Amino acid sequence: MKKKYRVIILQILILIFIISINGNFLIGVFWITLHELSHIVIASSYGCKFNNFKINVLGAKAEICEIEELSEKRKLNVYLAGPCFNFIIAMMMYILNYKYNLVIFENSVKINLSLGLFNLLPAYPLDGSRICEILR
């Protein structure tokens, strides 16, 4: 069996496993997509072009053209946009949960805090690795 097909089958099996364990999978995909969109919005405001968006069970990636041509400060802003988005949304969801006490808000707080912190880890291909490269 070709490697390409094995990877697809593995991703489908992982996806089935995740969905069967946690009903919050779609909420997570929603917040991951908006996390990547925040990178695109900030990069676009600096004149970069959006090339492609890829999502699979291992993560998501927004491909942005001309990002290497940006100043270090602007690149830092682009890379920080995703985690900052997640932390802001987590605070908003916390306030909504405090007021309305709905499970979806509580789960969104947990998901966004996790996404924000996870993406700040200094491990490639996460945002944290790119942030560390700039701050060195």
Question: For each of these PLM feature ranges, what is it?
Answer:
Residues 1-136:
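Hydrophobic transmembrane alpha-helices and their immediate loop junctions
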